[in-house]
């Protein structure tokens, strides 16, 4: 029986956690074993869960990130324990989601993966994998990641290791011979093709929705208590500029006579 192991910061919690859970359930319906390794925050899962590290590991890793700009470069013992677990599970496919956020040492993980024949699928939910440390660069309008990060414009760190981080990621991720990158949008795909990962196999798979709930229907707007031609809803876990808050407000102004 083939085995899928996914790695994400959460398990069946939040957007990426629920995406991993859905993928695991889909794999199990097709006869696969499913494991999800996670750093923190979880709810009940139908997959086999593998906890990575402890709360103390998370706190120490957070300090490494905040004080030393070393996200993804702490949690040595926790990641070595995960690698040992991977060798026990013997997965046919390792699918990565968000491996940042204070729980995993990506150098230790990729030094292991790069020596194996395991197929690695990495779903890109943000831009962290090909930048010096930021998840999104649009707000800063910074394109250094296309060549080489350094002297980061995000001045919210005591130490700037953006160039060092960028070069380490480039060295490790580029050497993963069985890596397939799965951007969740055409826009993300266009960015990956401008990064140091442009020569990797890139397959766009857009985030899905439950079509039994979200489907096209015919409605009688005149009988609606809202009495509006149509409605627009925008959803985000947190509302910030980089999440599209400004664009949503702009949409409201343009469609001032409609409800969204």
Write out the residue ranges for each language-model feature.
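Short N-terminal targeting/anchoring amphipathic segment
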Residues: 84-104, 118-125
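Conserved donor-binding/catalytic core segment of Leloir-type glycosyltransferases
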Residues: 182, 226-243, 249-252
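A conserved catalytic-core segment of Leloir-type glycosyltransferases
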Residues: 29-93
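Carbohydrate-associated surface elements
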Residues: 187, 208
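Nucleotide-sugar donor-binding and catalytic loop/hinge architecture
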Residues: 1, 216-231
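N-terminal subdomain of nucleotide-sugar transferases
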Residues: 1-49, 87-89, 114-118, 254-255
